[in-house]
C-alpha cells in the first residue's frame, strides 16, 4: 500500500509540473510565429511540352525538362503549429528551337517558357523534439500566369488556376535565421493547351488536349524568423 501511495504522489507531481505555466514551454521550444522563406533551385516540367524546331521543321516533345526556379513565402503560425500565408513562385525553362529564319532574321533560336504563381496557403509547422530541426508542409490555391515565345519576339501570355503544395525541412542557426530545403509542386489549369499560341503563330496547330502544366521542384535557401 505504501508503494502504491508513493507512486500516486509521483504521478501527481509529474502532472502538476507539466501543467505549470512555462514548464512545458521550457521542455519543448515553441515554433516561430512568423517565417519568411527565400529559395532558389531547379524544377522540372513533368507534363508534356511540344516545341516547334525551326531546323528540321518538326515538333519536338519534351517531358521532365529542367529549369530555374525561385520563390518567396511568408507564413504566420499559431502555437498549435497551424498557420496561413502567401506563396510567390517564378520558373523559367528554355528549349532549343534550332537554326532557322523568322522573317528576315536567321540564327539559332530558343523557345522560352516562364511561369508565375501567386496565392494564399494553409500550412502546418512542427519541431523534431527539442532540436533546432523543424519541418513544415503547406497547400495553396491561386493564380498562375505563363509567358512563352521565341527569341524573335513572338510572345503569348495566358493564365488560370494554380494549385500548389510544398514540404520542407530546415535548421535554425539562430532564433532569427535558418537554412532549409523545400520540395515544391505546382499544377496549373490554363486557357491554352501546353503546346499553344507561339506555335500557332508559326503556322502550327497541334495539341495533346491537356490544358495545363505540372511542375516539380527542389529548392533551398534562407529562413527568417520573427
Task: Describe the predicted segments one by one.
Residues 42, 68-76, 88-90, 120-124, ...:
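Residues on the lipid-exposed face of transmembrane beta-strands in outer-membrane beta-barrel proteins
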Residues 25-79, 83-84, 211, 215-226:
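Short glycine/proline- and aromatic-enriched beta-strand/turn motifs that initiate or cap beta-hairpins
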Residues 32-34, 64-68, 112-118, 133, ...:
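Residues that define the transmembrane beta-barrel architecture of outer-membrane proteins
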Residues 49-51, 59, 93-97, 165, ...:
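Predominantly the C-terminal beta-signal and adjacent terminal strand-loop region
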Residues 54-61, 103-111, 148-156, 203-210:
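Extracellular loop and loop/strand-boundary signature of outer-membrane beta-barrel proteins
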Residues 35-37, 81-83, 132-134, 168, ...:
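Membrane-spanning beta-strand positions in outer-membrane beta-barrel proteins
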Residues 1-34:
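Cleavable N-terminal export/targeting peptides
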Residues 31, 77-81, 91, 127-131, ...:
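Outer-membrane beta-barrel channels and translocator barrels
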Amino acid at each position: 500500500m505504501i508503494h502504491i501511495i508513493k507512486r500516486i504522489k509521483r504521478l501527481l507531481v509529474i502532472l502538476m509540473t507539466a501543467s505549470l505555466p512555462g514548464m512545458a514551454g521550457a521542455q519543448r521550444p515553441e515554433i516561430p510565429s512568423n517565417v519568411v522563406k527565400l529559395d532558389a533551385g531547379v524544377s522540372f516540367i513533368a507534363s508534356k511540352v511540344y516545341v516547334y524546331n525551326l531546323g528540321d521543321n518538326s515538333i519536338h516533345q519534351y517531358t521532365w525538362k529542367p529549369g530555374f526556379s525561385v520563390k518567396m513565402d511568408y507564413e504566420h503560425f499559431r502555437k498549435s503549429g497551424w498557420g496561413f500565408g502567401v506563396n510567390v513562385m517564378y520558373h523559367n525553362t528554355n528549349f532549343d528551337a534550332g537554326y532557322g529564319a523568322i522573317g528576315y532574321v536567321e540564327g539559332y533560336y530558343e523557345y522560352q517558357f516562364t511561369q508565375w504563381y501567386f496565392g494564399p496557403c494553409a500550412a502546418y509547422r512542427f519541431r523534431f523534439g527539442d532540436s533546432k530541426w523543424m519541418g513544415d508542409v503547406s497547400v495553396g490555391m491561386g493564380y498562375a500566369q505563363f509567358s512563352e515565345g521565341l527569341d524573335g519576339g513572338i510572345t503569348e501570355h495566358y493564365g488560370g488556376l494554380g494549385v500548389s503544395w510544398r514540404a520542407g525541412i530546415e535548421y535554425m542557426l539562430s532564433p532569427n535565421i535558418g537554412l532549409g530545403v523545400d520540395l515544391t509542386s505546382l499544377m496549373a489549369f490554363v486557357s491554352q493547351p501546353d503546346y499553344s499560341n507561339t506555335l500557332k503563330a508559326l503556322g502550327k496547330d497541334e495539341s495533346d488536349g491537356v490544358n495545363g502544366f505540372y511542375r516539380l521542384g527542389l529548392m533551398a535557401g534562407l529562413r527568417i524568423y520573427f
